[in-house]
Amino acid sequence: MKRRLWLLMLFLFAGHVPAASADSACEGRFVNPITDICWSCIFPLSLGSIKVSQGKVPDTANPSMPIQICPAPPPLFRRIGLAIGYWEPMALTDVTRSPGCMVNLGFSLPAFGKTAQGTAKKDEKQVNGAFYHVHWYKYPLTYWLNIITSLGCLEGGDMDIAYLSEIDPTWTDSSLTTILNPEAVIFANPIAQGACAADAIASAFNMPLDVLFWCAGSQGSMYPFNGWVSNESSPLQSSLLVSERMAFKLHRQGMIMETIGKNNAVCNEYPSPILPKERWRYQMVNMYPDSGQCHPFGRSVTRWETGKNPPNTKKNFGYLMWRKRNCVFL
């Protein structure tokens, strides 16, 4: 009952929150949990290796057997369940140049002031660069709507702010960032970055290549795990890049767990310090909600950015992050 009341309040509140006014550089709107969501992106839905419902976007591998036997606490020791796979809306991201601008909530937090203000600039070689802040929200939409009822197959809880880059010194300082991604130096060369062309092509026609984990497809390089973007050609593209970096960063920090679409392994969740790119999708929800489609990580924005990236915007963006979940419905 409490969850339904919370959802009703969200629905009534959505669309009635004025754009952030405390900061003239901040703009946003509350995400409507019904009308702003691409509900077809939850598909395909699978039972074992069988597709129960088809989807428009490519799917990952699933367990071959629909019936799984999983460990259980005493006195049961073993439980039998159905192996299901679906795409779960599990997080929202704000991307902004204005510190404290909560794009997906529609207001600004004045406490941050001008700390680590985002920017766009050119270096001495006249190369475009920019800096963005990212906020990560826990957004367990399937739990609110009771779409999936097994606790082992959904992200529970309420909407919550899980991460603010403004209070993370590694997000603004590239030297500190190396603490989280010391391997970045290995891939900071033309050969490694040239290999990212293969990831961009794979993302454009199917799914990204997990083996090229340092690549963000058409968006550029996953490293470093901070808000600095070099060679910026499009603010919208940069906003996607830093959102994907944040997903990688939270995986590295152990804040996001991963499921595996294999027999037996499907019973549990596991830490994954390397981002499984093929198991993630994104959908724009701010400033121009796109409830008709979602896209694999790394896919070029040229397919859908028309009308969503005008030059007179204040460079504030919001995305809904979808994650593939394989689990055992008990």
Swiss-Prot record:
Signal peptide span: 1-22
Major subcellular location class: periplasm
Cysteine-cysteine disulfides: none
Superkingdom of origin: Bacteria
InterPro entries: TraU
Subcellular location: Periplasm
UniProt KW keywords: Conjugation, Periplasm, Plasmid, Signal
Gene Ontology CC, one term: periplasmic space
Coiled coil: none
Function description: Appears to be more essential to conjugal DNA transfer than to assembly of pilus filaments. Required for F plasmid conjugative transfer.
Miscellaneous field: May be part of a periplasmic complex containing other proteins.
Protein's name according to its UniProt entry: Protein TraU
Organism whose genome encodes this protein: Escherichia coli (strain K12)
